[in-house]
């Protein structure tokens, strides 16, 4: 079935971006694919200005000319266009400055709470995932070796597991 395509989105890395577009053009392109007007996209994307911190919108720059961190910010927000039920993010905290990492954690929590979005996050950053995830699945050589519900003790348990 092709039904999963309408409820799923992903941002894996900058290769998911269309480098010869500006951020606004990229968002309009995704919006068009999802049946959302330019006006709706323009209004919606303004809600992410605190996350963008003045570095993304209105820059008149091509996506390929942004830093890796700013490309990541643009791509993550692009993956949220149309309020998908499931969003896959690969190493979303990499290449982001500490302030943006904190903002991203808040953004993920807010989207999950407000829209019921499920985030599947692939990450090597134990601290961030224990702060934003309800469940953590450990994979080794493609096999699930642990499925953990996140508690206040999860970070310590993971640190102990990986130090052995």
Positions of predicted regions on the chain:
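Q-loop/switch helix immediately C-terminal to the Walker
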Residues: 21-33
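Conserved ABC ATPase signature
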Residues: 62-66
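Conserved signature/switch motifs of ABC ATPase nucleotide-binding domains
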Residues: 78, 82
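Catalytic Walker B motif of ABC-type/P-loop ATPase nucleotide-binding domains
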Residues: 87-91
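Helix N-cap at the start of a conserved alpha-helix in ABC-type nucleotide-binding domains
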Residues: 98-100
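Helical segment within the ABC ATPase nucleotide-binding domain
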Residues: 102-114
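H-loop/switch region of ABC-family ATPase nucleotide-binding domains
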Residues: 122-124
